Amino acid sequence: CLSEDGRLAVEPDGCRDVKFLLAKQGSEGVHLGDKVGFLITHRGNRHSDHRAAVVEKFGSSDYASECAKAILYGRNVRLEFPPEVLEEARAYDNATIDQAEAAHRMDLRAIPIFTIDSAETKDIDDAISLQKLENGGYELGVHIADVSHYVRPGSALDNEAYERATSIYYADKVIPMLPTQLSNGICSLNPQEDRFAFSCLMRLDEQGNILGYNFVKSVIRSRVKGVYKEINALLESMAAETTEPVEADEAAGPIDPEMLNALK
């Protein structure tokens, strides 16, 4: 909000040449510099004739959190889950994998699998593995969380995920695509937890050329949650052939020895 001829007016984000005078009704408690959502109530022949009404109040534009709320509002981001979605999600409170289903999948829990994300990431949806093969070359694994095992086509969860399309990370917060029982729980490849995944196992030669690959439904167990800063420091120290220890990010925990071996 800004002042226009002594009256409160709004200036749309990204459109500095257009201003709408605010109706007094509904503008109570709104101050200069506030972020608001507004509805155009009248379009005049001149900019000074435009009128608008406040429909949502956020707070001072001096605060990033209030600006973020306004941006999300302006893009119609869904902040809350509908009751029917939350009801379906409650079935996965503290869920663990179905052992009968696990018996029909390729068991990859014995190999060193790890994830690399930001320290703040909660919904961990992909992991990697790398092993030297006895007959030479390597097996590179890319493992994607098998969300489709839990989110069935046509369900309330499926419809909501379709509408949201992705989790949204902004500032120090996240708006998940799925309720936390799934996004942070049974569908997240958390360390030291058995999880269902789709895995692509690629056979590479010594030069990294792909010799073959296959896709499998799998059950995996991530050994460690790696973070970008930690992995970069590790790779830089290896490139410099230094023996100085690399400090792990506190949010990720200690660096797993098996992950170190995979990167050597």
Indicate residue ranges for each PLM-predicted region.
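Charge-lined substrate channels and their catalytic hotspots, especially those that engage the 3′ end
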Residues: 1-141, 148-193, 232, 239-249
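Short beta-strand segments
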Residues: 143-145, 203
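Conserved catalytic alpha/beta cores of large enzymes that bind or transform nucleotide phosphates
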Residues: 168-264
